[in-house]
Structures are given as structure tokens and as C-alpha cells.
Amino acid sequence: MSWTRVVVLSLLTTLLFLTFSSVVDSAAVRDDSKAGHPKGPARQVFVPESEASNFFKRRSRRSPRSYAELQAEQRVKIAANERWREYNEEQRNEHENYAEEARDESDERSRETHEQIREYHYDGLYPRYHWFH
């Protein structure tokens, strides 16, 4: 029974907090607010009609780009290409290191195996250079 009391108490506390919170006031729909004068974030999203039409007049779809816009776009492309190149170079280096380590381990194992075979087959009666003729 004590856990139900804890749950009910926590729910009531949350409800009380949400009731008096300023976040809920800004999210609630009010009847007395005027739609003509937006406040807060709405003012940043919606602009007057004159500013919106000037924005589209200033830069249409077919208008040539300014030199600054072209330069900024080129800088973004160059930076992206550089990041891509660095990433691929890092991946290639990691793969080369892994392949080199694998080759070294394989060479070491084969060398040890060959040494063991030589020692096993050598009986001391003839020089070693006669083995593989």
C-alpha cells in the first residue's frame, strides 16, 4: 500500500507543478491574446509581408549568385572534401597497419614452422645447405 501512496503523491506533485509553471502558460491557448501582435518565438518566425516580398525580389531562383555566395559555397565544399579525404586516409592507414601486422604474424609463424622442420630433419651428418637441392 505504501507504493501506491508514493505514486499518487508524485503524480499530484507533478500536476501541481505543471499547473503553476510558466511553461504551461506559454503553451496554453488563451482567448484574450491578440493574433495581430505575436510575442516571443512567433515574432522571429513570421515577418511582415513587405519584408517577405523584398526577400524574394532580392534573390530570385534565376538570379546570378554574388561572388561572396560563390566563395562561401566553395569553402563549404572544400572543407567537406578535406574532411572526406582525411577520413579515407585514416581508414587506409588503419587497414595498412592491420595488413602489415597480419603479414608479420604470418611470416613469423611460417618461419618458426620452417625452423622446426629443419631441426627435426637435420641429423648432423651433412651440411644444411644440401637440404633443399
From Swiss-Prot:
Signal peptide: 1-26
Organism: Sparus aurata (Gilthead sea bream)
Record's keyword terms, sorted: Coiled coil, Extracellular matrix, Gamma-carboxyglutamic acid, Secreted, Signal, Sulfation
General function of this protein: May be involved in the negative control of osteogenic differentiation of osteochondrogenic precursor cells in peripheral zones of fetal cartilage and at the cartilage-bone interface.
Propeptide, residue positions: 27-62
Family stated for the protein in its record: Belongs to the UCMA family.
Record localization: Secreted, Extracellular space, Extracellular matrix
Full protein name: Unique cartilage matrix-associated protein
Coiled-coil spans in chain: 80-120
Source domain of life: Eukaryota
Signal listed as a keyword: yes
Stretch list, region Disordered: 87-115
Species classification: Eukaryota, Metazoa, Chordata, Craniata, Vertebrata
